[in-house]
Amino acid sequence: MTSFLHAYFTRLHCQPLGVPTVEALRTLHLAHNCAIPFENLDVLLPREIQLDETALEEKLLYARRGGYCFELNGLFERALRDIGFNVRSLLGRVILSHPASLPPRTHRLLLVDVEDEQWIADVGFGGQTLTAPLRLQAEIAQQTPHGEYRLMQEGSTWILQFRHHEHWQSMYCFDLGVQQQSDHVMGNFWSAHWPQSHFRHHLLMCRHLPDGGKLTLTNFHFTRYHQGHAVEQVNVPDVPSLYQLLQQQFGLGVNDVKHGFTEAELAAVMAAFDTHPEAGK
């Protein structure tokens, strides 16, 4: 086993899986979601987000930070490939907020070929991300540990949807075109630097739980969900409490020389928002 895979399985608290099967893919997908949180703090600090293998390994594994789709799915792709999976990245367009025009390709997801079938894997869409791979098949509802999803197809375009109560909500659309590392670098740069990017205006975090629950944070507003229902909502009273919550609930490492952050740095980030703890968001 390579040193990278050893560090990866250690980070996931997961026994090494050496055979590329659908069941192994499911196990790794959920373990990754539960161990490595979605978070955008580096965009706000601000720090440049690097996508090369060394940078992702240092930040997500050794510094015990999280990241967003370009980082999380980049790391997941490398781990799957090193295990022996046939995997490559795709790029999607986020349509969750019903944009008036088609947005650019700013969401990284994965296409995995295993056991003579194609599967979509995605550990990087925040609170609504998949926690299990989906078979690349249209109009079939597929259950995951954290909700029901389906894929729809319009020509060469696929649309990922999740069930919200009695309705289906579109998340993003994509095709199966081959993407290059430069495409990810461009999408990553746009996501981090476009003035209207959602990542530049909110502190966002999510960590999924093995029992079907999840923890989310939007600025000072912390929510614990179980089976799709909010069971705890807290307005974090101040930055010191928030600093502790990021470590205790989301497992963020704060002490790494390069990727850690101080309470004062977090305070500077939160002061830039037009939001107050008592307001909730």
Curated annotation (Swiss-Prot):
Keywords attached to this Swiss-Prot or TrEMBL record, sorted alphabetically, are: Acyltransferase, Cytoplasm, Transferase
Instruction: Write out the catalysed reaction.
Output: an arylamine + acetyl-CoA = an N-acetylarylamine + CoA; an N-hydroxyarylamine + acetyl-CoA = an N-acetoxyarylamine + CoA
Activity control note: Inhibited by N-ethylmaleimide and iodoacetamide.
* A GO molecular function held by the record: N-hydroxyarylamine O-acetyltransferase activity
Chief place where the protein resides: cytoplasm
Query: What are the subcellular locations of this protein?
Result: Cytoplasm
Catalytic positions?
C69, H107, D122
Which domain of life does this protein belong to? Answer: Bacteria
| Xref: Gene3D superfamilies | 3.30.1120.150, 6.10.140.1930, Cysteine proteinases (2.40.128.150)
Give the signal peptide, or none: none
Any one GO CC term of the record: cytoplasm
Keyword check for Cytoplasm: yes
Q: What class of enzyme is it?
A: transferase
Question: For this protein, what is the EC number?
Answer: 2.3.1.118, 2.3.1.5
How is the quaternary structure described? Monomer and homodimer.
**Purpose:** Catalyzes both the acetyl-CoA-dependent N-acetylation of aromatic amines and the O-acetylation of N-hydroxyarylamines. In vitro, catalyzes the O-acetylation of N-hydroxy-Glu-P-1, and the N-acetylation of isoniazid and 2-aminofluorene.
UniProt lists the family membership as follows: Belongs to the arylamine N-acetyltransferase family.
Concerning NCBIfam families, the annotation shows: PRK15047.1 (NF011621)
Record's protein name: Arylamine N-acetyltransferase / N-hydroxyarylamine O-acetyltransferase
Q: Which organism is it from?
A: Salmonella typhimurium (strain LT2 / SGSC1412 / ATCC 700720)
Q: Which gene encodes it?
A: nhoA
